Regions:
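Sec-dependent N-terminal signal peptides
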Residues: 4-16
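N-terminal amphipathic/hydrophobic interface segments
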Residues: 18-175
């Protein structure tokens, strides 16, 4: 019985340490807040995730216990498919592999679609980018698509939406 307990204990310990090594964080200034048990990163913050996504910002707070990083100011995410996300407030959960923005967000997809919205989520496990807020998408030809919510399938480069959809083409026609 003791050997089973120790095996489970050491297995859990090894798995916990392995998951912490999948996140790379660097910045010019690093400090610790012992009261809140977080690490604070300032000036040229760079985070690389296990999925090889890169997150750059001016400021980040990392709570290792929760696996949560909060970002502020000049955030730029480049995912492994070369989609780019810009925002001023966001957080990344290293456990669930979900990146969420708070407030206005701009996305440039790898196929040159520009997306303006807010409160956008990048789910690395499901390989989707989505929002339940009003979103405006502009394609390479200048056509404008307004949606109440959307889902972008990263692997297939496909947009999906249910509900209100308005399309204005580059000639001024709309539907």
């Amino acid at each position: 019985m003791k050997s089973n307990f120790f095996f489970i204990f050491f297995s859990t310990l090894l798995l916990t340490n392995a998951s912490a090594e999948n996140l790379f964080i660097q910045s010019k200034n690093i400090s610790l807040d012992k009261n809140r048990e977080i690490s604070i990163f300032e000036n040229e913050v760079l985070v690389r995730t296990e999925e090889n996504n890169e997150i750059i910002s001016d400021y980040a707070e990392y709570d290792k216990k929760k696996g949560l990083i909060k970002f502020k100011d000049n955030i730029l995410v480049t995912d492994n498919k070369k989609n780019k996300i810009e925002a001023d407030f966001a957080e990344y959960n290293d456990i669930t592999k979900i990146f969420k923005t708070n407030g206005p967000t701009k996305i440039l997809t790898n196929e040159n679609y520009t997306i303006f919205g807010e409160d956008i989520t990048l789910n690395n496990k499901l390989k989707i980018i989505n929002s339940n807020k009003k979103t405006v998408i502009t394609d390479q030809d200048g056509n404008i698509i307004t949606l109440n919510k959307f889902e972008y399938l990263i692997e297939e480069n496909i947009f999906k939406s249910i509900g209100f959809i308005e399309i204005k083409d580059n000639q001024g026609n709309s539907t």
